[in-house]
C-alpha cells in the first residue's frame, strides 16, 4: 500500500511531484504536523532528529514499503501523548490557581516552534490545563444560570429538555477526559 501510494504521488499526481529530498522533507513535515499540530508534544531536538534520520529519504522509503520511520515517529507520539495525559491527571489532583495575572496562553501554535526543553513543554501544558479549567468553570456557571432561568420561567424553554447536564466539577470533567 505504501509503495502504491508513493508511486502515485511520484508519477501520477496532478502536480507531477517527484519524491526527491525536498518533497520527502515536506511529506515528513506534514506527517509531524498531522500528529502534533500545536507543536506541543514533540521537542525541537526530536523533530530535528527525525528530519536528519528520515527526511531526505522519506519518499524513497515509502516507495520501497519501508515504514520504519513513520512507525518510530508514531511510537514516540503515542508515548508522549501518554506522558501528556499522565501529567494532566497528576496536575488535576493538585490545587490550581485560576486567578493568575499576566499569564498568556498561545492557543494557535501551528506556526510556533517546537519546545526546546521539557520544562518549556510542561509550562505550556500547565497553561493549557488552567485555561481548560477556567473555560469549564465559566461554562458551568453559564449553564447553572440558564437552568435557573428556565426553572423560574418554563415558557422560556420552548420545548427544550429542562434536565441539566451531568453535574461534574471542572476537575472531574477533565479527569474524565484524560482517562
Task: Please annotate each region the language model reported.
Residues 1-179:
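Flexible, low-complexity junctional segments that flank or bridge functional domains
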Amino acid at each position: 500500500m505504501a509503495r502504491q501510494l508513493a508511486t502515485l504521488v511520484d508519477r501520477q499526481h496532478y502536480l507531477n511531484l517527484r519524491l526527491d529530498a525536498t518533497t520527502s522533507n515536506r511529506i515528513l513535515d506534514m506527517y509531524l504536523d498531522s500528529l502534533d499540530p500545536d507543536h506541543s508534544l514533540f521537542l525541537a531536538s526530536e523533530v530535528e532528529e527525525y528530519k536528519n534520520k528520515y527526511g531526505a529519504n522519506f519518499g524513497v522509503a515509502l516507495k520501497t514499503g519501508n515504514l520504519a520511520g513513520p512507525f518510530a515517529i508514531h511510537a514516540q507520539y503515542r508515548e508522549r501523548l501518554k506522558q501528556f495525559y499522565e501529567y494532566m491527571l497528576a496536575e488535576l489532583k493538585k490545587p490550581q490557581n485560576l486567578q493568575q495575572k499576566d499569564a498568556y496562553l498561545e492557543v494557535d501554535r501551528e506556526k510556533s516552534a517546537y519546545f526546546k526543553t521539557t520544562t518549556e513543554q510542561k509550562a505550556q501544558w500547565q497553561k493549557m490545563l488552567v485555561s481548560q479549567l477556567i473555560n469549564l468553570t465559566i461554562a458551568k456557571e453559564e449553564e447553572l444560570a440558564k437552568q435557573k432561568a428556565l426553572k423560574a420561567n418554563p415558557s422560556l424553554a420552548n420545548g427544550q429538555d429542562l434536565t441539566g447536564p451531568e453535574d461534574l466539577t471542572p476537575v472531574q470533567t477533565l479527569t474524565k477526559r484524560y482517562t
